[in-house]
Amino acid sequence: MKLASWLFGIASALAGLFDLIWAEFEPAHQPIQAWSDHIPGISVLARIAAIWLIGAGLALLIRPAARTGAAALAVLYGIFCFFPLPRLISAPRYFGHHPAVYIGVLVSVAQNLILFIAALLLWLHLTDPGRISRTVTILARILFGLCCIDFAFGHFTGIPATAAMIPHWIPLGGSFWTIFTGIAFLLAGLAIITGMLDVLATRLLSLMLLLFTVIVLAPRAFAAAHNHVPWGSNAYNLTAVAAAGILSASLTISREQAPR
């Protein structure tokens, strides 16, 4: 749990740092623009959120402040979950009422929902590690698993866009890896929800996300050094790596504490 907690904090702080440098919410993972292209004081709000992410993220690295940091991140990531919601109405108007459109919007929600779940579990663990209720664990498991399943369908319905991100030097082609990782997300989601090999699934999920960061996202950031999105995507993905690790640790602890 400690390593995942530290990575969660560092990656959150990095996301905040990039938001602060560009003085904006990162459009791909903090899509506040879904509400309006002209929100008064948006740059001020972005700076406040950036400082919040930096402060809360760094607090996770300091034992006495970690509980407060986890709570602060849970609040902010919970707020981020609402950013894409207007697109459930606006996106179909532009792109039609296709399943892929709704799945894509829900992917944006799920991206922050898994971070909210991880931050909440971390806060509960830091508050009283022996008192995380079975109900909370089950609810976290189901929501996280459903998010993974949504990511899977996002891959299946957006093969061309996702495949284009895969470097050409990787064998078998982008479409193969898009489908492969989609299946991996689907199996991970089902394992997490059902509790069958759930800890293994979360660890493999964390590894897959880490490899995606190293192989795909990191080179894109250096290739577009003045673009906020690639840098923010790297920070986000590292936070997601940590989120899967936090869930894995939480499931392990819950299993160890269960009556035999």
Residue ranges and their predicted role:
Residues 21-39, 156-176:
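Membrane-interface interhelical connector segments
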